[in-house]
């Protein structure tokens, strides 16, 4: 017997997709920046596809992939540096509070 879809209500403890996205964005703000960078690179390279000249399609796609990965890795590195810096500042504040 199938459930009546009109009567289904999600549990109260579950977040909807937008709330989950906002929560994860607050926890790690550089992830959406990395995703945005990848999308911008992909959109730009698709736009430039028309004027690629004599470059082979496979080479053009490889360059697009490398540029998008560079944006993602850059965002990951910025996130790691931000986390290390914030942990360092918290530790310094705790050390100053103990003295």
Curated annotation (Swiss-Prot):
- List the ranges whose topology is Cytoplasmic: 1-29, 85-99
Question: Does the record carry Transmembrane as a key word?
Answer: yes
Membrane-related topology note: Multi-pass membrane protein
Q: Which UniProt keywords apply?
A: Membrane, Transmembrane, Transmembrane helix
What species was this sequence derived from?
A: Homo sapiens (Human)
**Which region is the signal sequence?**
none
Which biological process, per GO, is one annotated for this protein?
mitochondrial respirasome assembly
**Subcellular compartments:** Membrane
Put simply, this protein is called HIG1 domain family member 1B
The cross-references to PROSITE patterns, in alphabetical order and at most eight, read: HIG1
What does the entry list under GO cellular component?
membrane; mitochondrion
Name the domain of life.
Eukaryota
Q: Which residues cross the membrane?
A: 30-47, 62-84
Q: Which residues lie on this side of the membrane: Extracellular?
A: 48-61
User: What region holds the HIG1 domain?
Assistant: 1-94
């Amino acid at each position: 017997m199938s459930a009546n879809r009109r009567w289904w209500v999600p549990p109260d403890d579950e977040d909807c997709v937008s709330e989950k996205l906002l929560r994860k964005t607050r926890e790690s703000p550089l992830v959406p920046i990395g995703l945005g960078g990848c999308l911008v690179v992909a959109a730009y390279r698709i736009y430039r596809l028309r004027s690629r000249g004599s470059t082979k399609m496979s080479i053009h796609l490889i360059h697009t992939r490398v540029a998008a990965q560079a944006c993602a890795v850059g965002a990951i590195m910025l996130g790691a540096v931000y986390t290390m810096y914030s942990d360092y500042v918290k530790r310094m504040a705790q050390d100053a509070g103990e003295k």
